[in-house]
Amino acid sequence: MIRHFLRDDDLSPEEQAEVLTLAADLKKTPFSRRPLEGPRGVAVIFEKNSTRTRFSFEMGIAQLGGHAIVVDGRSTQLGREETLEDTGAVLSRYVDAIVWRTFAQERLTAMASGASVPIVNALSDEFHPCQVLADLQTLAERKGKLAGLRMTYFGDGANNMAHSLMLGGVTAGVHVTIAAPDGFEPDPRFVDAARRRAAETGATVALTKDAKAGADGADVLVTDTWTSMGQENDGLDRVRPFRPFQVNADLLELADPAAVVLHCLPAHRGHEITDEVIDGPQSAVFDEAENRLHAQKALLVWLLEKR
């Protein structure tokens, strides 16, 4: 059966654990699995600009023995002169998987309904699930476990990282708190979905408008840019509500002494996170970025073996 990875809860807790175990193995032995030997191809489509996503997927596909066919969404007919369902059906005749970084989750869902190969969400407006796999791999390395950790995300609770951290985090048994200012809460649909999944794993989901309360005793502090791609012209009016949610030394002091700091990058230093914290000993930001490579390779291997 074809499996897609469009949102974090597309993997069950057991399946997520399988992918993370494989990611750890592939980090130790990068060329031990070659399911794309041939080479076989993976379509990698970008409607949004990318650095880490592009480099990590291209290199990962190469290490798996395959060839990445990388295209800019603007240079294709995606959703313009044929339906996305038809595009998914056609691309499935050429490649073994489709990786897509897009502006709209519904576009991924539409293409998946017509595709007969796995489709991977490399980022959408609602979710960033590959990033959260890398985050979880990083936490497992640093903490030696996932279940029972207390993770708080600070900033825009309505963005894709907050949604994916909720869904992916509770799938791993992590207690997730979203600390966000008024008006920037997570989508209630995804809060409900995360709480349903949390009921299976013994995790919890909490929302707070108090950054200090969110940091108190936390094992993991996560943040992301306050201004996502496409919001650059919103100016100071957008930034102002987030200032109390900056991850800085004072906030980190409230967390567990062995707390880990994550940021998916790119970071706006001096805004959502300070230099002192991102470059400090509790930061795992650059390990986290590296683990995009290993986690995504593991995901592709897992999906291809499910076909």
UniProtKB/Swiss-Prot annotation:
> Where is this gene product found?
Cytoplasm
Gene that produces this protein: argF
What this protein is reported to do is described as: Reversibly catalyzes the transfer of the carbamoyl group from carbamoyl phosphate (CP) to the N(epsilon) atom of ornithine (ORN) to produce L-citrulline, which is a substrate for argininosuccinate synthetase, the enzyme involved in the final step in arginine biosynthesis.
Q: Which family does it belong to?
A: Belongs to the aspartate/ornithine carbamoyltransferase superfamily. OTCase family.
Range of residues in the leader sequence: none
Stated EC number for the protein is 2.1.3.3
Organism domain of life = Bacteria
Q: Quote the pathway field.
A: Amino-acid biosynthesis; L-arginine biosynthesis; L-arginine from L-ornithine and carbamoyl phosphate: step 1/3
Q: What is this protein called?
A: Ornithine carbamoyltransferase
Q: Which reaction does it catalyse?
A: carbamoyl phosphate + L-ornithine = L-citrulline + phosphate + H(+)
Gene Ontology MF terms in the entry: amino acid binding; ornithine carbamoyltransferase activity
Regulation of activity is described as: Inhibited by arginine, norvaline.
Where along this sequence does the record place binding of carbamoyl phosphate? 50-53, 77, 101, 128-131, 264-265, 292
Q: Which NCBIfam families match?
A: orni_carb_tr, PRK00779.1
| Gene Ontology CC annotations of this record | cytoplasm
Keywords on this record? Answer: Amino-acid biosynthesis, Arginine biosynthesis, Cytoplasm, Transferase
**PANTHER family from the xrefs?**
ORNITHINE CARBAMOYLTRANSFERASE, MITOCHONDRIAL, ORNITHINE TRANSCARBAMYLASE, MITOCHONDRIAL
Query: Single Gene Ontology BP term?
Result: L-arginine biosynthetic process
The record lists L-ornithine as bound by: 160, 224, 228-229
